[in-house]
């Protein structure tokens, strides 16, 4: 802003009448007439000539008229007497924010990082069986990997067993396969542990072999005469 303060000493300079001891503000492109009014004019950079802007009652009005013409001729880089209202507001707002932040010392809390690793999140849910989701009230979809149970039959052949029904708390845990010991006799008859079963099988065995007794022969003796 081109403002000049002059202390008048009662002399007449440049057409401005000044009184003793009174400061006068001088604006760019503004002249004061002898009868007390203010004239505004600007130089046209294209035509290299002066452009008359008018006569105003106050020096501030004449200075504003000059600022408007200067922005039209030279754009935003023009030298003016007053800054734009938007520039004043933005400057005052930024200075107010800086002063308030410096006085109070309050800083905005940093944002927590987002959880982007979905595989680790699902893996943790699947490991504890979804207990964390139920405790925190979140809805989760755990992924369960069912493990087979290995059992061995008496003949030595391994068998893989899968639990088709999911039960809480029994995830990824192999289920035992109970194998009862069984004894096999030489004659193919089951010789189990249960005494009732063994007794009944013994009776059946005796009944089966009653009618199939062998011939009592001694090979060291001569055969009988009836043969």
Swiss-Prot record:
The gene is ERF4. GO terms for molecular function: DNA binding; DNA-binding transcription factor activity. The keyword Transcription applies. CDD domains: AP2. Belongs to the ethylene-response factor family. Class 2 subfamily. One of its GO terms (cellular component) is nucleus. GO terms for biological process: defense response; ethylene-activated signaling pathway. Residues 26-83 bind DNA. It comes from the Eukaryota. Residues 1-25, 74-111 are annotated as: Disordered. This is Ethylene-responsive transcription factor 4. Expressed in roots, mostly in root tip, lateral root tips, cortex and vascular tissues. Keywords: DNA-binding, Ethylene signaling pathway, Nucleus, Plant defense, Repressor, Transcription, Transcription regulation. Induction: Strongly and quickly induced by ethylene. It is found in: Nucleus. Transcription factor that binds to the GCC-box pathogenesis-related promoter element. Involved in the regulation of gene expression by stress factors and by components of stress signal transduction pathways. Probably acts as a transcriptional repressor and may regulate other AtERFs.
């Amino acid at each position: 802003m081109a403002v000049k303060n002059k202390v008048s000493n009662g002399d007449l300079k440049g057409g401005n009448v000044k009184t003793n001891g009174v400061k006068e503000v001088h604006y760019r492109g503004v002249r004061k007439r002898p009868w007390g009014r203010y004239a505004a004019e600007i130089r046209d950079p294209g035509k290299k000539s002066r452009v008359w802007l008018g006569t105003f009652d106050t020096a501030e009005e004449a200075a504003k008229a000059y600022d408007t013409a200067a922005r039209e001729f030279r754009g935003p880089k023009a030298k003016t007497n007053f800054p734009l209202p938007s520039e004043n507001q933005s400057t005052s707002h930024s200075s107010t924010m800086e002063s308030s932040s410096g006085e109070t010392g309050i800083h905005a809390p940093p944002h927590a990082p987002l959880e982007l690793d979905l595989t680790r999140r699902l893996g943790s849910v699947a490991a504890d069986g979804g207990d964390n989701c139920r405790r925190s009230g979140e809805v989760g979809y755990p992924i369960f990997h069912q493990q087979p149970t290995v059992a061995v039959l008496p003949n030595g052949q391994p068998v893989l067993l899968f639990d088709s029904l999911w039960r809480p708390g029994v995830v990824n845990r192999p289920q035992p396969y109970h194998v009862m010991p069984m004894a096999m006799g030489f004659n193919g008859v089951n010789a189990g542990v249960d005494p009732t079963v063994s007794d009944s099988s013994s009776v059946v065995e005796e009944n089966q072999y009653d009618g199939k007794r062998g011939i009592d022969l001694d090979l060291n003796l001569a055969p009988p005469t009836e043969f």
